[in-house]
Amino acid sequence: MSLSRSEEMHRLTENVYKTIMEQFNPSLRNFIAMGKNYEKALAGVTYAAKGYFDALVKMGELASESQGSKELGDVLFQMAEVHRQIQNQLEEMLKSFHNELLTQLEQKVELDSRYLSAALKKYQTEQRSKGDALDKCQAELKKLRKKSQGSKNPQKYSDKELQYIDAIGNKQGELESYVSDGYKTALTEERRRFCFLVEKQCAVAKNSAAYHSKGKELLAQKLPLWQQACADPNKIPDRAVQLMQQMGNSNGSILPSGLSASKSNLVISDPIPGAKPLPVPPELAPFVGRLSAQENAPVMNGVSGPDSEDYNPWADRKATQPKSTSPPQSQSKLSDSYSNTLPVRKSVAPKNSYATTENKTLPRSSSMAAGLERNGRMRVKAIFSHAAGDNSTLLSFKEGDLITLLVPEARDGWHYGESEKTKMRGWFPFSYTRVLDNDGGDRLHMSLQQGKSSSTGNLLDKEDLALPPPDYGTSSRAFPTQTAGAFKQRPYSVAVPAFSQGLDDYGARAVSSADVEVARF
């Protein structure tokens, strides 16, 4: 290698060191600063994501409390849990990004500046030393040759000249070898730094791949089930349908707050105390087998609430005779559809209180009237035992006893009849019995009323017709604070409709078509 090439390689070696110190390290510091900004932004995303999924959990809690959207609440919980796991994987990636990349690069770049400065200085010093030794040998050889040319005996300096030539060759070889090694070392130092950066970035990429793989695995497994859960917004879950059917199949129900029933301001199922056993009232005869044709639409034992103002108040009703009786065939159809038909009401403006309708009632049920017409007297079978205790106005019976009804309609969930076994007469809770068909089979009588039961109206208005005493000591003020769960120890309260327990949950209110469109998602 010629001297000029050695000098050129020396300049290249110095340029490599200077490139690392003047370009690579500043660029690496800028990379670290940008990485810290990126880490800070991802940490902000993580913090925001926690708040976002906490809110999603709250939405899931709301949905889980609804009878119609409970499974969607479970879906929202699953979504929050899946994304929490994905977020945990993201946090692992952030830890790797901070610990394996930013921290180590920051430590390396601070140490590297001093190391490279020392390495470059050492190389330059050694290269200069070897170059000076070579220059000195060359200068000595030049002097020797001048002396040899002016001497009368040139052979005298020939041996010494050969020694200098050998020394110069050795010095030049050492210098060239050192410069070559120095250049190789400089390139190696540069490559090691870039490899370190790539290696740490690969570690971050590996954690990033695990993060995305985890997210893909979880979402691919759960997403089809989530999409299936919300595929049909109009589908009511079977559980909610069964709940509605159970409520619809119960004759009694829970009294809405604000309702009271009789003239004495007692709860509907609270009988009037101090009465004696009732004989069959003489006023009953005109009602047996004769019902007004205006009761054509099947209406359950009564309505109260915001829609009940279409009906006459109980206190204002007079003893009137029905005009005509519905055809037997029509009455039979109404009786068959009794359990599947909701009350038909007019659409009226809702009110904020039930107080204005506490003394109002509906016409008598068409299906039960039809039963009276066909059979003369309707018979029921006890499905629960009932003890009257010391109260002489109540009728005691045991499960399986048969009772003949002596009035056409139940009043406020209480019916009046005669036990075929004991021949005793008195009031009893109608929900404790099943109505017997013509063939002797029993069927469960149902009531979808939303307020007070329909009654015999003016017949029961008379002061000489006594009602049973209070229903097991419950007061009208106790009902508003009770829930449906409090009545599971016996059949639903005969005072209030069972269907009203879940009616508000399903938004069974009169709304305009425009409101429906706005509410639809």
Curated annotation (Swiss-Prot):
Its membrane topology: Peripheral membrane protein
Entries under Gene3D superfamilies matching the protein: Arfaptin homology (AH) domain/BAR domain (1.20.1270.60), SH3 Domains (2.30.30.40)
Listed InterPro entries: AH/BAR_dom_sf, BAIP2_I-BAR_dom, BAIP2_SH3, I-BAR_dom, IRSp53/IRTKS/Pinkbar, SH3-like_dom_sf, SH3_domain
Gene Ontology MF terms: cytoskeletal anchor activity; proline-rich region binding
Record domain IMD: where: 1-250
Compositionally skewed regions (Low complexity) per UniProt: 321-333
Annotated GO CC locations: cytoskeleton; cytosol; filopodium; membrane; nucleoplasm; ruffle
Modified residues (Phosphothreonine): T341, T361
Alphabetical UniProt keywords: Cell projection, Coiled coil, Cytoplasm, Cytoskeleton, Membrane, Phosphoprotein, SH3 domain
Quaternary structure and partners: Homodimer. Interacts with CDC42 and RAC1 that have been activated by GTP binding. Interacts with ATN1, ADGRB1, DIAPH1, EPS8, SHANK1, SHANK2, SHANK3, TIAM1, WASF1 and WASF2. Interacts with ENAH after recruitment of CDC42.
Name of this chain's protein: BAR/IMD domain-containing adapter protein 2
Organism: Bos taurus
Lineage, opening ranks: Eukaryota, Metazoa, Chordata, Craniata, Vertebrata
